[in-house]
Design a protein with these regions (language model features):
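Structural beta-sheet core signal
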Residues: 61-62, 126
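Binuclear metal-dependent hydrolase catalytic cores
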Residues: 1-61, 69-72, 77-78, 136-163
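Conserved acidic
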Residues: 65
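Cap/insert and terminal regions of metallo-dependent hydrolase folds
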Residues: 69-157
């Protein structure tokens, strides 16, 4: 879909590499004895997957393009993110902006904070920021989120994450 010429000027025939695609849905993938990945599909207009990556004794969970049900957090994603060392969560909107964007397939920073607390995650990284928010607004969101969940940071260019 994303490689449709309407959205992307390069066709598959232009690639010099052999490309193999695998459909991933609700799965457990063993990459090696040390690396395991679990995936869960969730609400987004064109579908989306969240990932839990376990490396040795460390875990990070990546939840993007996620629209939680209106009255609660997605139960499957709560299960997926349990006890993550790092939770990287869609924080595209503020709670008030989210009300006007139902069906867009995104979360609020408030939902991300609730998810971090509910899953006993050690650290939260807010990302997939709304491009209409400026740096001052994102800094305000980050500091407000830290008042609720202290170990919160906003993703930004150049951020390096260590597990």
């Amino acid at each position: 879909y994303m490689m449709n010429p309407i959205f992307w000027p390069v066709s598959f025939d232009d690639f010099k590499a052999n490309l193999n695609f695998h459909t991933i849905e609700d799965e457990k993938l063993k990459i090696s004895d040390l690396i395991n990945i679990k995936t869960k599909p969730h609400g987004h207009p064109n579908g989306a997957l969240s990932f839990r990556v376990e490396i040795n004794d460390k875990t990070f969970t990546y939840i993007t393009d996620c629209e939680h049900p209106e009255s609660h957090l997605n139960k499957q994603l709560i299960d997926l993110a349990q006890n993550s060392d790092i939770l990287i969560h869609d924080a595209h909107f503020t709670g008030s902006d989210l009300l006007n964007h139902k069906g867009w397939g995104h979360s609020s920073w408030e939902q991300a904070v609730k998810m971090a607390k509910k899953t006993n995650s050690k650290e939260l990284i807010l990302f997939h920021h709304n491009p209409l928010y400026n740096d001052k607004q994102l800094s305000h969101i980050e500091s407000t989120a830290q008042q609720v969940f202290e170990k919160t940071i906003s993703a930004k260019q150049g951020l390096v994450i260590y597990l």
